[in-house]
Structure formats: structure tokens, C-alpha cells
Amino acid sequence: MSNRRREFIEYIDSREPVEADIDISDKADRLTDIYDSDTYGLNAMRETLPSHCYKKIREVMQTGSALDPEIADMVANGMKEWAIKQGATHYCHWFLPLNGLAAEKHDSFISIFPGDDKVLLEFSGMQLIKGEPDASSFPSGGIRSTWEARGYTVWDATSPAFIRREKNGAILCIPTAFCSWTGEALDQKTPLLRSMEYVSNESIITLSSLFNEKHKRISPTLGIEQEFFLIDRKFYLARPDLVNCGRTLIGAKPPKGQEMEDHYFGTMNSRIISCIQEVEWKMWRLGMPLKTRHNEVAPGQYEVAPIFERANIAADHNMMLMDILKNVSTKHGLVCLFHEKPFAGVNGSGKHNNWSLSTDGGSNLLEPGHTPSQNARFILFLTAIIRAVDIHADLLRASVAVPGNEHRLGANEAPPAIISIYLGKELDTVINNIINNTDIQAPGSDDMDLGVVGFPPLPKDSTDRNRTSPFAFTGNKFEFRAVGSSQVVNFPCIVLNTIVAESLRFIREEILREMKVSSRQTAFNKIIKDTLIQHVRVVFNGDGYSGDWKELAKSRGLANLPSTPEALTNINSEKNIKLFSESNILSPVELESRQEILFEIYNKSIKIEANSLYDLVSTLVLPACFAHQKNIAESVNSIMPFIQSQKSFSQPNHQYSHLSEVVESVNLLIEANQKLLALIKQTKDFNSEHSLATFLNQSVIPQMNEVRKFSDHLEGIVEDKSWPVPKYSEILFLR
């Protein structure tokens, strides 16, 4: 082991958990008192706004109705006074451009009038509602040129403003949308809000026309399970690949990985739990209802998850959570990795999106009745979702097509790249009975008898959990498991909202058309049955990891798009352009720009990885191998006189064999690395992002895998003290 790595290990061994600035014995820091205290939500508004203003802004937040400009100044003043009491000196419009990160520009509250040296603290309604950042400096997919810089941020009143606390002050952050001067959406939030409105309207009309239910708003809800790795910061900084790419580009399989199955739900390391506890307190102050935390399957991997929230708020909270996890982990001497596959040979990370639809009265539209077979409303929404996923599986796959997910989807740790739906035995029986015109037998609710005296019988859930399915029904929601851990959740949710809304409209119109010639019940049964017959092919309740499923999916006509370039190609198909433009979610220009940006992100990510790998091998791995090679050669040469003097020495000279293996492996690594460099140089010859992505996927990535193969082999035979970077056995297990 190198002296440097030994120093890291000794340092890590001496580290103690870092205490957060929270004293839970103090009443002011109790959860019930501090929850939501750093957001300008309804509680803070009630205390700072006039009654009529509060009622109006509450209506805006709860129903999504338009904000009256006349009350904007009152809201801005109340927000400013509240923020100043929280220690804020600056405010910012906090928005989500198309680069996958949050963006903000800080402005202080201070104002000075001409001829008056007195400083005033001001914040107007116009400053609250509208900002003007440079739109040309963010990814736009061609919508904005460098000389077309004007863009606008617009307050999203449905998502509360919040305080971000730093060591030397606080900032008032105002969630906003971001658009160009010509009106195109340049962010992740705007189309999400549009899609929420679309699915709300289509659900309201469907419930009114077919079930005589009256609602003002239906909200898509999300519960987001965030997975991540926490590793020691010293190991991270000693790995250029982790610093540059967020994942390791080399690294031999350690003697122990996750095969003992001892990490999942295991007792948390004290440094780790101290870090996560501080994150929880910060998120609770921001009004995020974090509920669970636990060790995940891979060593060093963890998960936190909140209670369901309205989709746009859940999306904002997830971005805030990722940001706070990064910052707090640094304080604790750790680094939080969100890459989908930071380490080869152990499970990668995802971000399961639990999606449902909730009425303004609090009812879950995906909650079956006493039994699913008795609930026509549930069956209609279920049928609409089945149809939506079948027709638009390509879009769902594209919505999770990020570079890191290529390493995860399709492996025996995550859902396959084939999009299918898992319903469970009970619902599958109901669906087949509808299709086959057989009587629907209500299964009733069974109990599980654990066979232990003193243990009560436990009610069985109506569905099992199928972790191999990318889109699974789990009792009262659908769990979209293919979303990558590093992703902004907005685009997958936009797609889901949009395709379900379109499907609801189609089925409703078909039923209403059929009702002109038959009874309501007959029309309902016919259209539901016909729709299920046409789209039930997407339902699969078996093992998604099996090779048989790939063959079966192919026979059913389901697409298998394992690579990111393949998945992104279909985004701007005629079908998808029509879907988004007719629903006013994304114009053809906005959709094409997103496809272009996703290709750009993929290409830049792979090129960074390829260059990082070449440099890592050239400047760290090969010098270590040369030194080891020299040591072996000198050692073997030093014993040559002895070997030559032993005429009866009959044993094969394994030392020569070992030297030959090292020399050959080093030669192969040099050759592979030079081939990689040649391919990197070829990337400059491409004018199309699409064709470049295909080249990177089919040529550069396979060559990177070749380089890694030889490097990892050498890691296993080069003297440990000579190896230049921390190994998996150290990074994954030492905290």
C-alpha cells in the first residue's frame, strides 16, 4: 500500500462523526416546531399578509389559478420582511435550466436613492414575479444564440419560496420558470406545470362526464426515492476519474463486494448517519417530508425517501435535497455520488418515481375500491395508463436516457431497457377476465399466517413487489423505477402526465361516442375491453432480468433500446411531436431543442470520460506499472547467477512467467490506450450530435472498456504499494 493511501486510511480511522448545529433538547429545534420554518408557505403568509391577500395567494398555491398583479407588491413586501427576519440579505430567482442543475443569481435587498446616502431594503412585486438572466449562457438546443441573450424567469407561486442558509448569511430563493424572450420554455419546470394542468383538465372532464364527479383540480403526485453513495472525501480527491466524471473508470473487483448481502438495511455507520441526520433536519426546515433512510444493497450506498407531494413541489424538493446532500457531506468529510454507476461490480443507483393522481378532496384515483374489480373508475384510469405506456414506451425510455443509466438499465440490478408494466396477480386476473368476458371473482383479502405463536395474522397486499419491472403497480401508485439517480425528475414526470392525459381523453371520447348507440355500461365495457385487448401486450408480471423476457418482448413487438443514442432518436418522431404540440406541453421547436441538448450532454459526458481515462492511464497507471516492471526485472536478474549455478534446478521459473505477464499486460494497456486516443481525435470530425453519439457509443465506449480491462488486470498483479489510486476495497468499505 502506498504511503499516501496508508495516510488516508489512518486519517479516516481517526475521524469522528460531525455534530450538526441542532440541539433537539431545545424546544425551538424540535421537529414539530421547525418543520417548514424555512419556507414562505401558508403558515408564514398567514402571519405576514393582509387577510384578503392571504386568501388569494392560498387559492393560487392550491389550485394553480393566476396571480392578481395587484397583490404582488403586498406578497413581495411580506416575503421580504419574513426573509429579513430569517437573516436573508439577498434574494434569487431559483430555476432549473436544461443542464440538469439548479441556477440562481443573487441580488441584495439594498437600494440607494439618488442624492440620498441612506440605504433602504426593497423588494417589489415586479422583482418577485420577473427576473432577466442571460438566456444564451444556458443550454437551449439552438433556441437562443449567443447574441440573443434575453430570457425571463417567472415566479411559480405554487411552489413556496425558501431560505437557504450558509455559514455567513442566508438567501431567499424564489422558485421560478425560465423562458426565452420569444416565449419558448428553456427550463424543466415550465413544461412540468403545463403537463400537470393537462392531466388535471383531462381527469376532471373524464370524472365529470363518465362518473358525475365534480372536481376543481386533480394533481399528479410524486414520491421520490433517492439513492446515492457516500464515500470519504480523501479517497474521492485522490481519484481523478471520480472528480471529473462522478464514476470510477478503472477499478478491479475487490475480494469482497456485496455478495454477503450484509449492507442492505444494515446498521448505519456513525459518520454516515450523522451526515444524513443533518440533511434531514435541513430538509424538514424546508418543508420536505423526508420519511425513510436506510442502507442500500451496495456497500457505501444509501437511500432517503419522502412522503408523496404534488409533482412540481416534489421535483423542487428533490433538487434541493441533492444540493444539500452534496454540501452537508462535504462538511462531514464525505462526498455524495449521484452517478447511476460509480463503481463496477456492485449495484448502481436509481431514483424510483412513485406516481399517482390525487383529487382536490384527497382521494387517490389509483387506489382500488374494496376490491379492484368493483371499482369502474379505477379500471378506467388503469386502462388509460396501460394504453399510454404501450403506445409511448419509446418516450418513457427516452425520458430516462442519461449517460449513467446505460451502465445500469438491463443489468441484474435495475429494470431492463424494455418498458413494460407489472400489475400483480390480482389485477392481472381482473384484466384477463375483462378481456375474456369471464366473471370477475372478487379475490377478497387474505391473511398471512406466520406460524409463530403470539404473532397476529397480517393482511396480504393485493400485489407483490417486482423489482425487475420498470413500471410497477404497487397498490395505489405506479413506481417508475428506470429513472436515474442523477436525473432531474421533471422530464420523466412530464412524459407520464402527458401520455396519461392523452389516453384519458381518447378513452373518454370513445366511450361517449359509443354511448350514442348503446347504454353507458355497455359502452364503458366495450371500450375498456377493446383498449385492453389492443394494449395488454405491455403487461408482464415475470422476471424482467431473464433472457426469455427479451425474446418474448420481441415477439410482442415491444422495443428494446439499451443505448442512450437509440433511445433519444425517437423523441422528435412524428407521433411524439403531435402528442406534445396538440397538448400544448412542448412545441416542435421546444421538443427538438430538448433532444439536441440530451445528445449534447451525452456526447460531452462520454468525451470527458474518454479523455479522463486516457490521462489517468498515461499519467498514473502506466508509471506505476513501469516501476513495478522494473522492480521485477531487477529482482529476476539478480538471481540469475543462482539459477544458472543450480544445474539440477528442475522447477519452472515462475518468476520469469510473472515478469512476462506484466510486460505483456503493460504492452496491451499501452496499445489499447493509444487506440482510445486515436478514437478521441476522430470525434472532432462529426458535425451532427446524433452521429457523434452513435460513434461514441459503438466505438469509443467499447475501447474504453478494453483499456479498463487491462488496467484492472494490472491492478491485481502490481505491487500494492505502487498502485497510484485508492482501490475499491478501500473506497467502498472504509468510512
UniProtKB/Swiss-Prot annotation:
The keyword ATP-binding appears for this protein: yes
Keywords assigned by UniProt, alphabetized: ATP-binding, Ligase, Nucleotide-binding
Entry EC no(s): 6.3.1.2
Gene3D superfamilies: 1.20.120.1560, Glutamine synthetase/guanido kinase, catalytic domain
The GS beta-grasp domain, residue ranges: 89-183
GO MF terms, alphabetically ordered: ATP binding; glutamine synthetase activity
Pfam families: Gln-synt_C, Gln-synt_C-ter, GSIII_N
Assembly notes: Homohexamer.
Family label: Belongs to the glutamine synthetase family. Type 3 subfamily.
Protein name: Type-3 glutamine synthetase
